[in-house]
């Protein structure tokens, strides 16, 4: 449609007697004059939108006539007229979603798909079909470990139904029902490398274990943690290759800094969601290497400058930004002032939700300037200990609002279960 003749399209429309007024503000030095103009047809609507875009990007995209032709061809005249009206009055980017069922970010991706233009904008974008047209449900877990020789893995291998016996049925149903499911991949997939000298705990899983992620309905993993580099550079590269071969996106680490800084985007129900990840750990040690322009590693945020750039990029290119952060002090149920200070910077940079991990125990939750933060989800399936854990659930409603929930779970005897009234009573009595 990019080569369509707009004049031919306009002339093909029947004459319309409707007149839509919109306001244009013109500023010259020290005075402002507001004029009431009239949109009678597509020419007027195009002129209004293109004039607006010459002054300010719409949704950070330089909207041109080719794009407007595409919108007209796919959504009709009335949508273009209404978008022109609303956009001129208050630069309301939500009107694109209201009129087409897709945000300006999603429209741009669809336009690029149809025309073959700006193909780089389609990288790291995954399209999801949701269970409901009214909401997008995202679930997040804490630490999971499939490492060879580790207690969780040995227990799993001894069960008749393998990993299915390590989680309650209702919990697995919940995880698979989520539209987007994310876990913290707290180990490396490889058969290569040696454990880092001097490190107390090192975790490496056979690459075939990646198939276990299907049990959870996993859509994305975080590699921004202090165990993904436990067996060195080669094992990290194997981890990335293993995930790519399995078709599972990752964030927070990469084969170089550009890869480690790259957000992952999901498109669902006409909205575009960015997920970004980084690790504050290790704070005083350097076992886990930071990615550079030429070497693999994780994205670190002890100094948050790089991660703030990632958040800002994601903010410019999506409707929502969710940050998954590895931080805090192991074994401490109380979040620290350093976590709060980082969270404040992330919120100012534009995140909508912050999910934390690393401490192997739950930490508190709060809202900061309207942004929900769970400081640590702790272990999800990591040890034999009896621990409180849970799923963090983010629900994006059709009206654009975000609901934030915590679904409590218990990790006990190598099995993680949703807390029901019956299980809660049993756990409390013990």
What residue spans do the PLM features occupy?
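C-terminal motif of bacterial Sec signal peptides marking the signal peptidase cleavage site
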Residues: 2-3
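N-terminal, intrinsically disordered, polar/charged segments of Gram-positive cell-envelope systems
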Residues: 6-42, 124-137, 153-166
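N-terminal compositionally biased, intrinsically disordered segments and leader/signal-like regions
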Residues: 26-28, 33-35, 101, 116, ...
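Active-site-adjacent structural elements in enzyme catalytic domains
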Residues: 40, 44-47, 209, 234
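Active-site-proximal alpha-helical
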Residues: 45-115
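Short, low-complexity, Pro/Ser/Thr/Gly-rich segments in the mature regions of secreted, periplasmic
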Residues: 110-129
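Acidic, metal/ion-coordinating pockets
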Residues: 127-429
